[in-house]
Structures are given as C-alpha cells and as structure tokens.
Amino acid sequence: MDSINQVLKLGLPKGSLQDSTIDLFAQAGFHFSVQSRSYFPSIDDDELEAILIRAQEMAHYVELGAFDVGLTGKDWIIETDADVVEVADLVYSKASMRPVRWVLCVPESSTVRSVKDLEGKHIATEVVNITRKYLAKNGVNAMVEFSWGATEVKPPDLADAIVEVTETGSSLRANKLRIVDTILESNTKLIANKASWNDPWKREKIENMAMLLLGAINAQGKVGLKMNAPKSAIDKILAIIPALRQPTISSLAEEQWVALEVIVSEKTVRKLIPELKRAGAEGIFEYNINKLID
C-alpha cells in the first residue's frame, strides 16, 4: 500500500521511562524534540506522530486503537489485561539495561517472613490485580488497596505490607523496607494494536522500528575496533581478542598485511588495545556502535 498520507501513531511513556526511551529512540535513528509541558513531541519522521502518556495507561489505549504502537511494561499489560500484540522485548529501564521487579515488602522490624503471614492483613500497591492474583495463587486472603504513589511510606501505619516496583532496591532500603518475595519481573515491551498489526504498511513500519530499537539495545556497551597487522601476527592477535563475533579479516594492498575489524565489550578496551599493540597490530581505531543488528 502506498505510504502517502499514512501516519503511525506512537505512544511514548511519560514519567520515569521518558528520558531513557527518548535516548533509545535517538540511538535507533528516531530523533524526538520534547518541549517543556508539551505532550506532543516532534520527530524527524513524517510518517510518525507521537504522544506522551503514562505507561500505566498505554496498553489500554493501544488496545482501543488510540495508538497503533506504544511502549509499556509487561507489568502494565498484565495489570490491565490488555489484548495487544507484543512485538518485541526491550530490556531497558530508567537507570539500567535490566528488568525491574515487583516485590512484596514489609518494614524491617515486621514479623512477616512469607506471604502466608499476611492472612487478613492490609497491602497497598499500584498493581492491585497482579497482587490479588499472587495472593490467590498462594491461598492468602488479604485486603489489597490501590496506592496513588509514595507507597514506600505507608508501612506500618497505613499498610502492613506493600507491593512495589524496584530496580536497584535503594529506595526500599532508604525507607527501611525488607523484601519478602518477588512477585513479577517486568521489562519494557513494544506493543501494537491488533488491527494496526494486520495493516501491511503499519506492520512493516512497526517491524522496522522494532528491529532498530533492538539493534540499539544490542549495541549498548559495545564498540568496534579496526586495525592493521602483519599476517605473521594474526594468530597471536586472534588469541587476544575476546570477540563477540568472529573478526572480519581483509586483505590489504601490501601482501603481507591484513586489516582486522571486530566488535568487543567497551569494558575490555583499555586493557585490550595495549595488548593488541604489543602483539603487532598497528593503526588501531576504536569507534562507537549505535546499532548492532543480528
């Protein structure tokens, strides 16, 4: 289908994931400009329209068709029981490249040691449905109350326990809370409306976006190295390189020399480059990688 006048409506998560999501899209090649107090970012792609909305509501609006595609957590898809297409797992969060956890917490001084100890107790959380399913699975009858935020401050006066999301655990420790159990691990997902997914033009646009976003995630923490080396040093150099993939070796005009190119973890480079130099490599060149497509 001709793409003239076609637009893909994209929902971006507002709040804690906003900055890391905008940065990820930039690395993938989509550059947004977000003005202060505006919910409508501009983008350097005439076939995209973007709106900022809370991740908690994203799956619901994607299901309704208000957005063709959006980014939200696995947790909110489950919590809202949204019927959407889960296009891709994008494992990143506001502070790291790893999943977040929804955990059952109590005050450090609490006698609660397992979920069974919460029979008849009061639990505060943003994920009421997820928590109720967890309690039912464990045969526990407790009161679950929706929390509008600042959930960590509620125990012990306003709740006996909470179910809260954590990435590093620092906020829980700061509020003297102890983790009793992990209820759910969650990561960001690219999701699509079912009707949009069945539209050939929109599906191709969404699949291309997913490929580039996954490529950007895959490239994080990696760099490329190029170098020249005499053929006599190849075996020694290959033994040094902790390659994520087999190096590319190309012939040079000078018959006894080759060019090597390899992708490595950025953490290894400061140790690796001097070793490569001592092994006989010359003209070593390090470069950043924005996307790494498998």
Swiss-Prot record:
Which Gene3D superfamilies does its entry note?
A: 3.30.70.120, Periplasmic binding protein-like II (3.40.190.10)
> GO biological process: any one?
L-histidine biosynthetic process
The Swiss-Prot or TrEMBL record annotates one GO molecular function as: ATP binding
Which family does the entry's similarity section mention?
Belongs to the ATP phosphoribosyltransferase family. Long subfamily.
Q: Name one Pfam family in it.
A: HisG_C
Give the encoding gene's name: hisG
**Where's it mainly located?**
cytoplasm
Name-wise, this protein is: ATP phosphoribosyltransferase
Q: Which UniProt keywords apply?
A: Amino-acid biosynthesis, ATP-binding, Cytoplasm, Glycosyltransferase, Histidine biosynthesis, Magnesium, Metal-binding, Nucleotide-binding, Transferase
Q: Which organism is it from?
A: Pelodictyon phaeoclathratiforme (strain DSM 5477 / BU-1)
Q: Which cofactor does it need?
A: Mg(2+)
Q: What does this protein do?
A: Catalyzes the condensation of ATP and 5-phosphoribose 1-diphosphate to form N'-(5'-phosphoribosyl)-ATP (PR-ATP). Has a crucial role in the pathway because the rate of histidine biosynthesis seems to be controlled primarily by regulation of HisG enzymatic activity.
InterPro entries noted in UniProt: ATP-PRT_HisG_long, ATP_PRibTrfase_cat, ATP_PRibTrfase_HisG, HisG_C, N-reg_PII-like_a/b, N-reg_PII/ATP_PRibTrfase_C
The subcellular localization recorded is:
Cytoplasm
Spell out the CDD domains in the cross-references: PBP2_HisGL3
Which domain of life, per UniProt?
A: Bacteria
Q: Which pathway features in its UniProt record? A: Amino-acid biosynthesis; L-histidine biosynthesis; L-histidine from 5-phospho-alpha-D-ribose 1-diphosphate: step 1/9
| The UniProt record lists the keyword Glycosyltransferase | yes
Q: Which reaction does it catalyse?
A: 1-(5-phospho-beta-D-ribosyl)-ATP + diphosphate = 5-phospho-alpha-D-ribose 1-diphosphate + ATP
Its GO CC terms are: cytoplasm
According to its UniProt record, the EC number is: 2.4.2.17
| Activity modulation notes | Feedback inhibited by histidine.
NCBIfam families, alphabetically? hisG, HisG_C-term
